[in-house]
């Protein structure tokens, strides 16, 4: 049974199938009856909740508050900002009617043609338009600024090719929308939130990221600048893991949102928006997991420790239960989340396989001999190693181990990125090396034409212009024209 539970397609055989197998078998999510939409199962949602809780704390620490805005957006709102509507038009789900009626043939229900909406409603693909229409009523003076709002919501983008967590027609996310009196304040906010995302990715997800600015071709529709964090997955593909946009005055002008400054002069408000989504779940899975299942960083694991009793009879189980209760109390007192699995419908071997598959960072196993010796077996998921340790001070042992696992997972991912990041100077070398995957740093002349040619010929895109990258000027690898710095290329999800 344990073997059957864990049978995953090896990554070396098919990375895509391995990912699909893992999401399903680890009970994270499954496909639904609605094309392109997923059911996030309790274990998967528990991970998302931990992400959500931590990010929400970080937002509030930087002065943000939560609000909620409508799911439906009048179609005319989307037309106000030309670049914005062009960027999202092909992905919009549109509500045209508000009522069903019984089918005259007696077979189910049909759309009532008499219930057509005067103006169609868009199911939000993102909320800039509805929020800036609202902000118009909130802002009159510089005293009303800044507004620092975040929203936790679902959005719909009618994707044609979907994959669980990575690209679905409906997904969960947070979107921050802020309003400022000056350009400098708004730019500072956009960069601040990029730092929040980078800190979360590295310190909680244990996922190293490159911070940078998107090229004009890759920029968010309607933004002046898009800041991004880019991560490298184990198959050598990049994953955009969070974006923060400096919107300038574009949306304020589209919705006529002005304010009176300290001198009484009226000006348009400056704006940002920023967001991460359940796509981070896909990033987490692909950054660390292996052919045995999930590998979760302790800071985001639904439970950090599982205790499995090994016994031959009810008397032994009762004794282990008593000792386990003491261990659980000690661990919880240290802020460590723990599950005790003394269910009798599965054998210990099956449980070991299940918790390995689910990526529980630390497994404790206790049998009759451990009771006699005051010991316990401790196994770590990241290295698949185990040892027997004394029970005295077990909470300190486990706390230290969890810290070490968090650091080790990050270091392993960082080492992978370093080993798969190269610098090239010629387009011929670029075309050869991009086939191996990974990040490539190369010079680019800054034109959309060159960027589009590279994408068409190699399927690689500019992931970002790194903020802390190699600032040595050079010549574009394609055209030979001057280039101020190297940019980051990769094939991407």
UniProtKB/Swiss-Prot annotation:
InterPro entries: aa-tRNA-synt_IIb, aa-tRNA-synth_II, aa-tRNA-synth_II/BPL/LPL, Anticodon-bd, Anticodon-bd_dom_sf, Pro-tRNA-ligase_IIa_arc-type, Pro-tRNA_ligase_II_C, Pro-tRNA_synth_II. GO terms for biological process: prolyl-tRNA aminoacylation. Keywords: Aminoacyl-tRNA synthetase, ATP-binding, Cytoplasm, Ligase, Nucleotide-binding, Protein biosynthesis. Its EC number is 6.1.1.15. The keyword Aminoacyl-tRNA synthetase applies. Its main location: cytoplasm. SUPFAM superfamilies: C-terminal domain of ProRS, Class II aaRS ABD-related, Class II aaRS and biotin synthetases. One of its GO terms (molecular function) is ATP binding. Homodimer. NCBIfam families: proS_fam_I. Belongs to the class-II aminoacyl-tRNA synthetase family. ProS type 3 subfamily. This is Proline--tRNA ligase. It comes from Porphyromonas gingivalis (strain ATCC 33277 / DSM 20709 / CIP 103683 / JCM 12257 / NCTC 11834 / 2561).
